[in-house]
Amino acid sequence: MEKTISQKLKEILLNADWTQEELARNLNTSQKTVNLWINEKSTPHLKYTQKIELLYLDIIGYVDINSEILSKRKSDAVSKKISVADIIKNNDVLDVLTLHLTYHTNTIEGSTMTLADVKEILCDENKVLSNKTAKEQIEAKNHRSALYFLLDELNDKADKFIWTKELILETHLRLMNSIVYDAGAFRNHGARISGSRVALANYIKIPALIEDLLRRLNAPADDLICFFAQTHCEFEKIHPFSDGNGRVGRLLLFVSALQHGIMPPLVLKEKKHAYYKYLEIAQINEKFELLETFIAESIIVTYNLLKNKTSE
């Protein structure tokens, strides 16, 4: 049965973690109007019905993708070029990327810190937020440390940069230091993701599976977006750590794009539901088209973020 406008709006609010005011802003209308639609006191005109439908699919996730649209999205994404040197030598660009990547990736994993909170913590080493947990504040600083470590490695080694087991373990150590007891080590126990149908790797097989993944990460790639989707999917299915797999995986995806001179993808916290949906489809059915589209669109998100920030 087709969901009502009210049901779709409620799902958008829940999954995007928006207020009614934020939802109204994304629909270019007033909060009062959105409230009337949600409570079925008013019916949106066709123009807004179409906007709601597109926003709903964007947040909740599509079920398929037209091949021509996929091709166009991928072509647009790979045309957005940037190098790690471009980022490191421009403090404004580095700060914007660090702030937004840290905020969105940690929020996806449950952090309640706002963008302003993260900015405060990253800008002032001595800052302590009394209304946020110590863990959340450590997570923000640790994420920056892990990101800077990878960026420096890529910048220093340039075309000699390769992915290694030690690099991945060091990234996890920096990311999860003071948060988990086994930071910087592969898990030595079984694991499952609550609510997911994906069967994760047996911990005994993790070292061998990581070696296989490293060979793929270090091999040439013709279709970069497909390459990013498949390697990201593979890492998350291996799920090599007791915690922090999503954040490490998105860091690897981010830096892998930079390694190939492409604008890195920013996975928005509002699109967490769609992201997980596409990832699960790829992992279970080996159908990567939706995840490819999502990654391509996430690259454009980063491009637009930098374009808007540098023009301010």
Region spans (language model):
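FIC/Doc superfamily catalytic core
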Residues: 1-243, 247-312
